[in-house]
Every structure is written in C-alpha cells, then in structure tokens.
C-alpha cells in the first residue's frame, strides 16, 4: 500500500491569455486552479496523474487537452482487470490511435479547431503496478536523494536531432496533430522508493527553468508545496 501526497496546480502564466493545459488527477479535470490530496493507494485501485498541453491557437489547444484527458479517464475506468503487461501495452496503443483520430476528426468537423493537438504525459496505476505514458514534450521527473532525473523523453526535433538551434517547441508527436501518434509506455513499479517525489509538467515550466534550477528548488523544499517556489522562479526567469 502506497501513501501518496499530491499537489497539482494549473496556471495561465505571464504571457498567454488562455490556458491550454489540462490536468487529469484521479478522475477529476483541473485547469486554472490548485488542489491537494493525501491518500492511500490500495491494491487494485486505479490512480491517474497526467498533464496535457494543448496547441492549436484560439481555443483549439484548450479543447484538445480536454478531449485527451477525458478520453484517458474513460479508458482507465473501463479497462478490464487481469490484463498482462503485453495486452495492456496493446490497449494503450489502441487508446492512442483512437484518441488521435477523435481529436483530428473534431478538427475537421469544427473548422475553428483545425490542426489542434495536445501532448500527454503522466502516471497511472493498474493491478498494483505503476506505469508511465508519454506523448510529446511535456515531462515527468523523479526527484530522489537530492537528484532530479527526467523519466520521459521529449518527442521534439531538437532532442531527436541534437541540434540546439532548433526551437524546443517543434515536436513530431502529439495527439491530434500530424498523421499518426505513438506513446512511450514504461512500467515504473520496480523503480519506486518511499522517498520519491514526481513532478509532471508542461513546457510552460520546463522551457522557463532548466533541470538544474528545478533541482535546486526541490533541494530547498522537497515537498509538494515546492510548486509555489517553482512558480516564483519561473516568473523571475
């Protein structure tokens, strides 16, 4: 049984006039708000913690991130019990394809949303195991023993080519945009320690603060309330 202490926060930031991020946390969707919860994760329980960062201009990004988080919430709720890792991996692939098609088709049906898409990254529990799903360039970090480690990979042209002159926000994989999408799917169960702190964020944070700066903040305040300090540093950056 795991004791989880969670804090989530969604903030428009200092530049944009709308917030295209959406948080999925244990069946709830959150945008432009903060929320805290402490609970025990009992065996067989389904737990979700994800961030989706929409793109598409106007309100397209907001709509895409909402569609993706709603779709995954339905997926995890309806997922049958007793699936093997291999079968679960196949179900994740099916969900990615279906959700990509859903968002793409909505963009065709509603011209104001044409070309919209979203990243999607986070963790979920299933059958006493913890898994990571990653699509795009939003990030999942683990902080342990004073060291911050990025667990997700950016599906960006910069990371793919190693060319640092390429803008960091040029991505080649997302739900809705492009001809297809894929997900990195990884089991984390054997890598978990009681002391671990996980940070899930969009590029609204990771583009403003380096990994070293995030690590420095967490070293001073290694608890969920670190969000306040991270947000302050982001504003100063």
Model-derived regions, located:
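PP2C/PPM-type serine/threonine phosphatase catalytic domain
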Residues: 1-231
């Amino acid at each position: 049984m795991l004791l989880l202490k969670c804090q989530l926060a969604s903030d428009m930031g200092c530049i944009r006039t709308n917030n295209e991020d959406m948080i999925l946390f244990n069946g709830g969707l959150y945008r432009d708000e903060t929320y805290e919860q402490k609970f025990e994760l009992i065996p067989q329980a389904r737990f979700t913690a994800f961030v989706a960062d929409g793109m598409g201009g106007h309100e397209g990004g907001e709509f895409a991130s909402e569609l993706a988080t709603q779709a995954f919430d339905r997926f995890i709720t309806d997922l049958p019990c007793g699936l093997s890792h291999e079968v679960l991996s196949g179900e994740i692939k099916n969900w990615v394809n279906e959700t990509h098609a859903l968002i793409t088709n909505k963009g065709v049906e509603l011209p104001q949303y044409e070309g919209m898409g979203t990243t999607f990254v986070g963790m979920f529990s299933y059958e006493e195991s913890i898994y990571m799903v990653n699509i795009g360039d939003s990030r999942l970090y683990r902080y342990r023993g004073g060291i911050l480690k990025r667990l997700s990979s950016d599906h960006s042209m910069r990371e793919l080519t190693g060319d640092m002159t390429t803008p960091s926000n040029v991505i080649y994989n997302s739900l809705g945009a492009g001809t297809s999408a894929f997900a990195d799917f990884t089991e984390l169960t054997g890598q978990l320690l009681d002391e671990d702190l996980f940070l899930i964020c969009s590029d609204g944070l990771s583009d403003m603060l380096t990994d070293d700066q995030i690590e420095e903040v967490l070293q001073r305040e290694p608890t969920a309330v670190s969000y306040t300090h991270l947000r302050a540093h982001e504003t100063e950056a």
